[in-house]
Amino acid sequence: MTKIAYTGGGTVGHVSVNLSLIPTSIEKGHEAFYIGSKHGIEREMIESQLPDIQYYPISSGKLRRYLSFENAKDVFKVLKGILDARKILKKQKPDLLFSKGGFVSVPVVIAARSLKIPTIIHESDLTPGLANKISLKFAKKIYTTFEDTLTYLPKDKADFVGATVREDLKQGNKERGYQLTDFDKNKKVLLVMGGSLGSKKLNNIIRQNIEALLHDYQIIHLTGKGLVDDSINKKGYVQFEFVKDDLTDLLAITDTVVSRAGSNAIYEFLSLRIPMLLIPLGLDQSRGDQIDNAKNFESKGYGRHIPEDQLTEVNLLQELNDIELHRESIIKQMETYQESYTKEDLFDKIIHDALNK
C-alpha cells in the first residue's frame, strides 16, 4: 500500500485532476490526503466532494509577475507554508507527492524535496504556469495535457499524458436535459458559459444579440454567480448562475458551446465532440494561458476563438455561422483526437515514475 499526498489549488482547474485521481487511489487500496490553502477553492471542493479525505491547510502567498508591496509580505507566507507543509509531511510520511499546481503547491513541493519525498507535477495548460516552473526544479517528473507543452520543458523530466476527463461526462441524459430546459428537440442548442466567475462582457453581448441568436438556436446561458438577468423571459432561453450535478445532461443536448478556454473544460468539449467558440481570459485577467489554449485548439480545427477585447455582437454571430458552415469537418477533426491515459493508467504511471529510480 502506498500513501500519497495531493496538492494544488487556487482555481477549479488546479483541483479537478486530483478529484479524479484520489478516488482511484482509494479504490486501488492506497491512502491519500490533501494539502491546500486555508481559504482557497480547493478546500471547499475537497471537503464537499471527498469528505473522507483528510485536508491539511497551510499558509500560502500569491505568486505575482509584477512588482507589488504584497510580494514582500507573501514571501513570509510562502516560507511559513514550507514549514507548515514540512511538519505535515514529516508526520504523515507519504511515499510520494502529486502536485496539480497553483500558488499553494510551491511550498508543499519544496517541503517534500527537503524530506526526499518524490514529487510528480501536472500541467494542464499549453504553457507552464509560474508555480509549476518553480516546482519543476524540485520534482522528479512533470506531466502535460498538451503535447506541444513538451517544447517548453526539459526532455528528461516531461511526459505527455493528455487530458484526464471525468468518466461521468458521457453519461448525460438527453431526456433530462430537455426537461430541465423545456427545449424543442428539433432545434439546435447553444451553451454559453463564461467560467466560474462569469463574464460580464460575454453576458452582455449574448443578451444584446438574443433575438438573432434565438433565430438559429435555443440558448442555455450559464451566467456566473449573481449575473442572472431576471428581466429577460424568452422562449428558448434559460439562465443559470452555474450548474453542477445537471451539467452532463445539459451537455448531452448541446450542439455548440461558447466558453472560456480553461484546459479542463475545452478537453471535455473535445471528448464530447462539441464544436466550440472560445473566448479566452485576456492578459488583463490572467497570464495568457487561456489565449494559448484557444489558439492551439483553433489550429487543430476543433473550433474558433475570439480574444475577449475584440468580441463584438457582429463577430460573435460571424464565428458561430462559420462553425455551423464547417460543423462536419470540425467534428471529423475532433474524432481524430484520442485520449492517451485513463485515470487508472495515469495513476499507475504516477506510482511507477515516482517510486522507481
Swiss-Prot record:
Entry membrane topology: Peripheral membrane protein
Q: Which CDD domains match?
A: GT28_MurG (cd03785)
According to its UniProt record, what is one Pfam family this protein matches? Glyco_tran_28_C
Instruction: State which pathway it belongs to.
Output: Cell wall biogenesis; peptidoglycan biosynthesis
Where the protein is mainly located, per its record? membrane
**GO molecular function terms here?**
undecaprenyldiphospho-muramoylpentapeptide beta-N-acetylglucosaminyltransferase activity
Q: Which GO terms describe its cellular component?
A: plasma membrane
EC class of this enzyme? transferase
Q: Which residues cross the membrane?
A: none
Single biological process term from Gene Ontology: cell division
Which InterPro entries does this UniProt record tie to the protein? GlcNAc_MurG (IPR006009), Glyco_trans_28_C (IPR007235), GlycoTrans_28_N (IPR004276)
Known catalytic reactions: Mur2Ac(oyl-L-Ala-gamma-D-Glu-L-Lys-D-Ala-D-Ala)-di-trans,octa-cis-undecaprenyl diphosphate + UDP-N-acetyl-alpha-D-glucosamine = beta-D-GlcNAc-(1->4)-Mur2Ac(oyl-L-Ala-gamma-D-Glu-L-Lys-D-Ala-D-Ala)-di-trans,octa-cis-undecaprenyl diphosphate + UDP + H(+)
Residues bound to UDP-N-acetyl-alpha-D-glucosamine are 166, 196, 290
Report the EC number(s), separated by commas if there are several. Answer: 2.4.1.227
Mind listing the UniProt keywords for this protein, alphabetically? Cell cycle, Cell division, Cell membrane, Cell shape, Cell wall biogenesis/degradation, Glycosyltransferase, Membrane, Peptidoglycan synthesis, Transferase
Q: Where in the cell is it found?
A: Cell membrane
| Family, similarity comment | Belongs to the glycosyltransferase 28 family. MurG subfamily.
This molecule's function is given as: Cell wall formation. Catalyzes the transfer of a GlcNAc subunit on undecaprenyl-pyrophosphoryl-MurNAc-pentapeptide (lipid intermediate I) to form undecaprenyl-pyrophosphoryl-MurNAc-(pentapeptide)GlcNAc (lipid intermediate II).
Protein name from the UniProt record: UDP-N-acetylglucosamine--N-acetylmuramyl-(pentapeptide) pyrophosphoryl-undecaprenol N-acetylglucosamine transferase
Provide the species name: Staphylococcus epidermidis (strain ATCC 35984 / DSM 28319 / BCRC 17069 / CCUG 31568 / BM 3577 / RP62A)
What is the name of the gene encoding this protein? murG
